[in-house]
Amino acid sequence: MLPTLTSSDPAPQDDVPLLSRDKTSMNRPPLPPFTAQTASEKARLAEDAWNTRDPARVALAYTTDSRWRNRAEFLHGREAIEAFLARKWRRELDYRLIKEVWAFHDSRIAVRFAYEWHDDSGNWFRSYGNENWEFDQYGLMRLRLASINDLPIKEGDRKYHWPLGRRPDGHPSLSELGL
C-alpha cells in the first residue's frame, strides 16, 4: 500500500502518492483518465519500452499483481511478466514493434499493433494483434489482454528497418504503412 498524506503533511502534488515523488517513482504518467493525446502518449511509451527488449524495464510499467492474457498464456504478477518477456525475446529475434491507439475511455486503452521478428532459423514473421489495457490511478497497467496472430513473411517483405531500439520519430505508423 502506498503512503498517504495526513492533514499535517504538505499539500499533495496533484494527488500523487508520496512514494512517487522520490527517485523510486511508482507513478507512470500519463495518468488516467486518458484523453486522445495522453492515450497516444501512453501507447508510444509502451512501444518504446517494448522495443528495448529489456524485460526488467518493461515489467516496471505493470502493477506487482498485474494480470495478463497473452495468446493462450495467463500470467499473474510482475515477476511472471518479466520471466515471460525474457523467454519471448530469446525466441523473437530482431524484434521491432509499432502500436497504435484504437480506442480509450477513463482508465482503459485499446491498441492494435504489429511487430516483426525472426526465429533462430532465420524465418521472418509479422505478428498482428490487439491489446486491451486497464491502468490503476498511478498509471501502472493492472490488466493486459492480448490476442496475437503470426504471419510468416519473406525477409524482403519486411516494413520495419530502423536500427534496433526506439522507432524513429517520423517513421510511418501502422495506418500509414497500410497494416
Residue ranges and their predicted role:
Residues 8, 13-16:
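N-terminal polybasic/positive-inside topogenic patches
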Residues 18-34, 83-179:
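A beta-strand edge to alpha-helix "cap/lid" segment located at domain peripheries
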Residues 38-41, 55-109:
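A solvent-exposed, acidic/Ser-Thr-rich amphipathic alpha-helical stretch
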Residues 3-8, 84:
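A generic structured-segment signal
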Residues 2-5, 18-64, 174-179:
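Short, low-complexity N-terminal intrinsically disordered segments enriched in polar/charged residues
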